[in-house]
Regions:
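Acidic, turn-prone loop/beta-hairpin segments
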Residues: 1-40, 47-64, 89-97, 116
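Histidine-centered, metal-coordinating catalytic motifs and their short helical/loop contexts
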Residues: 41, 110
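Extended, charged helical/alpha-beta scaffold domains that provide interaction surfaces
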Residues: 55-79
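C-terminal edge-of-domain segments
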Residues: 73-107
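Terminal, compositionally biased segments used for targeting/anchoring and flexible tails
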Residues: 84, 120-121, 125
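Short cysteine-rich clusters marking metal-coordination/redox-active sites
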Residues: 106-109, 119-122
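Short functional micro-motifs and their immediate structural scaffolds
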Residues: 111-117, 127
Length: 127
């Protein structure tokens, strides 16, 4: 019996209604911001100030023009860090300050917080 490989089949085409240029532009901009954050995180990792990105706490300066696309984004989730604070400034380029997160590590979500998660349940997981 001859089997045809899944790798030889064609993918279904997405309906044109799935194309959302505004959403695409938003995520392209968010990825640019995340890349700046990742560079800052990697500098701290290279200098051995932090181990993983979850040991990092970010302060992100963004131009006010980016408020519309980023106000509903949790940058700690996007950048996989323990915390992230966003500050909007007039005519500002994207700048990131990375510091070592303070507090204790949750055994459930692995984030480092000053308000330690209960070891049995984690507020991050109940949201």
């Amino acid at each position: 019996m001859l089997f045809r490989s899944i790798h030889l089949t064609k993918f279904l085409e997405f309906p044109k209604s799935f194309k959302n240029e505004n959403l695409n532009q938003k995520w392209l901009e968010l990825i640019k911001i995340r890349n700046v954050c990742n560079i800052s995180i990697e500098e701290k990792r290279a200098s051995k100030e932090i181990g993983s990105s979850l040991e990092a706490s970010l302060k992100i300066n963004l131009d006010k023009k980016l408020n519309d696309i980023s106000e509903d984004v949790d940058f700690s989730e996007l950048c996989i860090t323990s915390s992230a604070e966003v500050i909007y400034l007039e005519n500002s380029e994207t700048k990131v300050q990375t510091t070592k997160a303070e507090g204790s590590k949750c055994q459930v979500c692995w984030k480092i917080t000053k308000d330690a998660c209960s070891r049995k349940t984690c507020p991050q997981q109940t949201e």
